[in-house]
Amino acid sequence: MSETIEGNVQILRLSPGDSTNFPKPGDLVTIHYTGTLENGQKFDSSVDRGSPFQCNIGVGQVIKGWDAAIPKLSVGEKARLTIPGPYAYGPRGFPGLIPPNATLVFDVELLKIN
């Protein structure tokens, strides 16, 4: 099932979570992710590092697309997030890794709300 939310961020649900526990703004979450450019070129992966990523969601610690999409996932859910440039790294990109205004694709799994 695919859903488009604010910022034209797309959420493609790959496997369900518990459908009960959703993070709220300010919650510390633990996530596994793999980030690619639209052409499939991988730029980062917590899975490859073998270490999940933790952040406070909904408070500007991560890109806007994550702040918008992660609260729509329940614990255990896997999804593919397609995030347009303005909700990713915008016109500055991430030099050496992500071109300016690039649309990014993240395969994410919400492991837990800490």
Swiss-Prot record:
Protein name as annotated: FK506-binding protein 1
Tagged with keyword Cytoplasm: yes
EC id: 5.2.1.8
Gene behind this protein: FPR1
Enzyme class, first EC level, given as a word: isomerase
Family indicated by similarity: Belongs to the FKBP-type PPIase family. FKBP1 subfamily.
Activity-regulation annotation: Inhibited by both FK506 and rapamycin.
A matching Pfam family: FKBP_C
The UniProt record lists the keyword Cytoplasm: yes
InterPro entries xref list: FKBP-type_PPIase, PPIase_dom_sf, PPIase_FKBP_dom
Task of the protein: PPIases accelerate the folding of proteins. It catalyzes the cis-trans isomerization of proline imidic peptide bonds in oligopeptides.
Span of domain PPIase FKBP-type: 26-114
Superkingdom of source: Eukaryota
